[in-house]
Amino acid sequence: SITDAGRDRSDPHELGTGYPLYAAKYIRSEHPDTDFEFIDLGISGDQTINLVARLQADFIDIQPDLVSIHIGINDTWHRAETREWLDNETFEANYRKVLTEIKEKTNAKILIIEQFLLPVPDKEFFREDLNGKIDVTRRLAREFADCYIPLDGLMAKACVGCEPTHWSADGVHPNENGSDFIGRLYADAFNEMLKAGKLG
């Protein structure tokens, strides 16, 4: 839902109200002479296994120039009530399958956006599962990504001297401030790849 953000799923160019909207706004304003096409295919509640099922339609068939992936918090959230966590090996296998297929069957550059959790009391216990999965994500990023946004650390930094509720009401779903913050980071990563000659 962080990427989905209420988008109109009948129109993949409609970016909802979350970070994709802000990222596109920044990129368009900083590159006014380039007509970029932005597609948002985020689906609220999806986990890594759902991305595997969507590989053909949402990645391979489209053949994008850049793929950005922000996945993983739901692999933790959906099991939090029972604490019957998905093992890290299965999480990695799912994520690795997605990244391998993108590498092998498209020419897309890959931007991975790390999953994050803000310091809110009722979800602190998520860390017993989430931290290991962030480690997996970072390891996969070193292997597959052209650029990486270490969002968990950056959001932790943003909460120093600023209440977590400034960014998110529940510690997981960004509000307008949080979405703008992530969108800015996305645009910075995009510009970094552009400057390095990885795009275009």
Regions of interest found by a model, annotated:
Residues 43-65, 82-95, 103:
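Catalytic-core regions of hydrolytic enzymes
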Residues 1, 11, 41-46, 66-83, ...:
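Cell-envelope and extracellular/periplasmic
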Residues 115-200:
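Catalytic His-Asp segment of secreted/periplasmic serine-dependent ester chemistry enzymes
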Residues 37-42, 66-70, 109-114, 148-150:
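Structural recognition of the beta-strand scaffold that forms the well-ordered cores
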Residues 9-14, 81-88, 125-128, 167-169:
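Short glycine-enriched, charge-decorated loop/helix-capping segments at active-site entrances
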Residues 4-8, 49, 76-81, 119-123:
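A short acidic, helix-capping loop that chelates divalent metal ions and anchors anionic groups
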Residues 1-41, 55-63:
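Serine-esterase "nucleophile elbow" of acetyl-processing enzymes
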Residues 70, 74, 98-134:
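Active-site segments of SGNH/GDSL-like serine hydrolases
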